[in-house]
Amino acid sequence: MQTYGDPNVSYAWYAANAGAVTNKSGRFISSHIAHTGLICFGAGANTLFELARYNPDLPMGSQGLVVLPHLAGLGLGGISNGVFTDTYQLLVVAILHLILSGVYGGGGMLHAFRYEEKLESYPATSRANKFKFDWNDPDRLTFILGHHLLFLAAGNIQFVEWARVHGIYDPVAGAVRQVEYNLDLGMIWNHQFDFLSISSLEDIMGGHAFLAFFMAAGGVFHILTKNYGEYNSFKGADLLSAEFVLSTSLAGAAYTAFVAALWCASNTTIYPVDLYGDVLQFKLGIAPYWIDTDSSLAADAHTGRAWLTNVHFFIGFFYLQGHFFHGLRALGFDFKSIGKLFDNLETSETTLN
């Protein structure tokens, strides 16, 4: 995993994925499935928690809810004018996520303890063998990247079709309605620069439809193509590693967290006022933060919008630090050398004195 010192370093049990997953393609699958199980469990458990304390007589935005407003935005729970009329649908969603978390957890354990550590252990003609990888094999890595892009495209298609067939919550109408996507490329291009002010559900769905096509095309491209020319250091030779992938993943997560924070703080189309509360006011103290503008809230109460915005921002900040840390390690920087530097300085001072 590390690109400095001994590349075959042994990790202790508490290093978790560093020792159990690094350079083991089969264990990568196990880790992915198990992490999906954790996400499903968190989603289901939080839905039940919020459902137990939801009060239909109070504005949803003032109750500090996070998961239920998202489900309402998807048109679930018989949402009307910001109030759920059929919470049984939400209960079904929560229980389904909890059941799936157990299934995913079992799948993670199955791949961890029953199946091979490395996919190259399977016959060369098997499907599993196609997804083996080596960090210095660009053709295999781009093949796997292509499949990731196809799954992302499928997620976008699912969302667009859900809005078109079932419908999503329209804050203007105060009801669920079917939304046809607006695939206007000029509109999509312009919204790169003013995405915080987007006010049309049709435009939002059009953006997702475009992303579905773009990612699907990218997925097919990466699956069918191979590295052109010499695979040199400029293209990532001897640089790509589990830690490098972790670094870039953290950068992507930080970027999306920052965008989500800015969007949630100010946009009322994707984050309706009757579901998340009023827009927030930006403040700058020791660190940037956002505060509620609703004077009717109790002194110690916060809207769901305030929770979402601030948590996303600070998580994004720490993800960014993780990106720099792991990125520098992937480039070969040994952070232990900093401690050695100070030790040498202390030794030099002692000698001079």
Curated annotation (Swiss-Prot):
Keywords: Chlorophyll, Chromophore, Membrane, Photosynthesis, Photosystem I, Thylakoid, Transmembrane, Transmembrane helix. This is Divinyl chlorophyll a/b light-harvesting protein PcbG. Belongs to the PsbB/PsbC family. IsiA/Pcb subfamily. GO terms for molecular function: chlorophyll binding. The antenna complex consists of divinyl chlorophylls (a and b) and divinyl chlorophyll a/b binding proteins and binds more divinyl chlorophyll b than does the antenna complex from high-light-adapted Prochlorococcus. Also forms complexes with PSI, consisting of a PSI trimer with surrounded by a PcbG ring (probably with 18 subunits). Is the only subunit found in this ring under iron-replete conditions. The antenna complex functions as a light receptor, it captures and delivers excitation energy to photosystems I. The Prochlorales pcb genes are not related to higher plant LHCs. The lineage of its organism: Bacteria, Bacillati, Cyanobacteriota, Cyanophyceae, Synechococcales. Its main location: membrane. The chain crosses the membrane at residues 28-48, 64-84, 90-110, 204-224, 244-264, 308-328. The keyword Transmembrane applies. The gene is pcbG. GO terms for cellular component: photosystem I; plasma membrane-derived thylakoid membrane. It comes from the Bacteria. It is found in: Cellular thylakoid membrane.
